[in-house]
């Protein structure tokens, strides 16, 4: 029997969401994504301590921020030895509201990859989907630096990213699901509110339909999954980035996978254009409590893990 993972690959580019690159090969993903939390998790494992120690030792005289950049590149370089496609490397979340600093950091990361012999076509620079992050992506894209817009929870964010010419967006499925489930409390009914009605799944489907209907080239990569079911409800999405534990579950399953999203069906979607000027963007994101709360929470969490990583590095110097 064909596995659910292999069936999914017929419709969607499968991406591995992990810093634990030793797990990559068995799932044969095209691309890989990392973030500060995933790198922090990986360097705390014994398997990656030599890479951490080697990186810190080689760059011990540099500021801690520069050492973190080198560590991100070290992980990205190892990942690219295993996968045929692209790796996503994230800009420090503490720069989420600073356009110029985000642009500078994106350029720095691409330059560091170049020093390791890796061309920019194999790297996606991850930026938070704030107004400032979107503006940074607009500049970087014009320089041929491809951007992956993360912490994306609303159609307003997605519309702004597409208008800015971002290469790819990562709308978060599981975190949207978490918010609605938590807020519903005892009224939540998984049978009724999950599956195709899952708020996170519906959000990505709407964004996908918007892009295809209006002819945007920006790739849609569903992210932040909680269950295999959420993933399979988005079969046909351009890309899906999936954690190793869920990749394993899909590999062990022989459930029949049907295509749920396609460009042709999306073109008939009943959906209006969203204004993407700054005032509209800020109002629309603010108007959606889930998007506002999850964006702020996500930035705080990634920033906190960056601080933990700094402390870990300082302790090794």
From Swiss-Prot:
UniProt cross-references to CDD domains, sorted A to Z: Transaldolase_TalAB (cd00957)
Lineage: Bacteria, Pseudomonadati, Pseudomonadota, Betaproteobacteria, Burkholderiales
UniProt similarity note: Belongs to the transaldolase family. Type 1 subfamily.
Descriptive protein name: Transaldolase
NCBIfam families for the chain: PRK12346.1, talAB
Annotated Gene Ontology cellular component terms: cytoplasm
Record keywords: Cytoplasm, Pentose shunt, Schiff base, Transferase
Compartments reported by the entry: Cytoplasm
Catalytic site: 126 (schiff-base intermediate with substrate)
Molecular function in Gene Ontology: transaldolase activity
Summary of subunit composition and partner proteins: Homodimer.
Family matches, as PROSITE patterns: TRANSALDOLASE_1, TRANSALDOLASE_2
Catalytic activity: D-sedoheptulose 7-phosphate + D-glyceraldehyde 3-phosphate = D-erythrose 4-phosphate + beta-D-fructose 6-phosphate
EC number(s) reported in the record: 2.2.1.2
Keyword ATP-binding attributed: no
Principal place of residence: cytoplasm
Function: Transaldolase is important for the balance of metabolites in the pentose-phosphate pathway.
Listed pathway(s): Carbohydrate degradation; pentose phosphate pathway; D-glyceraldehyde 3-phosphate and beta-D-fructose 6-phosphate from D-ribose 5-phosphate and D-xylulose 5-phosphate (non-oxidative stage): step 2/3
GO biological process: carbohydrate metabolic process; pentose-phosphate shunt, non-oxidative branch
Family annotation (PANTHER family): TRANSALDOLASE
């Amino acid at each position: 029997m064909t596995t659910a993972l292999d069936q999914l690959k017929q419709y969607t580019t499968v991406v591995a969401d992990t810093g634990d690159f030793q797990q990559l090969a068995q799932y044969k993903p095209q691309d890989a994504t990392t973030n500060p939390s995933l790198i922090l998790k990986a360097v705390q494992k014994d398997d990656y301590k030599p890479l951490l120690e080697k990186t810190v030792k080689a760059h011990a005289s540099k500021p801690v921020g520069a050492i973190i950049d080198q560590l991100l590149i070290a992980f990205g370089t190892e990942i690219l030895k295993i996968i045929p496609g692209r790796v996503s490397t994230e800009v420090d979340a503490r720069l989420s509201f600073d356009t110029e600093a985000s642009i500078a950091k994106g350029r720095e990361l691409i330059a560091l990859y170049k020093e390791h012999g890796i061309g920019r076509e194999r790297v996606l620079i991850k930026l938070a989907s704030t107004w400032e992050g979107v503006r940074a992506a607009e500049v970087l894209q014009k320089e041929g630096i491809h951007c992956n817009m993360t912490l994306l929870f609303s159609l307003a964010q997605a519309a702004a990213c597409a208008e800015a010419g971002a290469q790819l967006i990562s709308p978060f499925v599981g975190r949207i699901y978490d918010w609605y489930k938590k807020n519903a409390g005892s009224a939540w009914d998984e049978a009724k509110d999950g599956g195709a009605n899952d708020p996170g799944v519906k959000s990505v489907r709407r964004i996908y339909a918007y892009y295809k209907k209006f002819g945007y080239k920006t790739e849609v990569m569903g992210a932040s999954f909680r269950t295999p079911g959420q993933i399979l409800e988005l079969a046909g999405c351009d890309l899906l980035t999936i954690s190793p534990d869920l990749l394993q579950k899909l590999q062990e399953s022989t459930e029949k996978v049907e295509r749920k999203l396609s460009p042709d069906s999306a073109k008939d979607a009943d959906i209006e254009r969203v204004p993407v000027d700054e005032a509209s963007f800020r109002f629309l994101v603010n108007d959606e409590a889930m998007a506002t709360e999850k964006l702020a929470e996500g930035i705080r969490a990634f920033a906190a893990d960056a601080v933990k990583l700094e402390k870990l590095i300082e302790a090794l110097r």
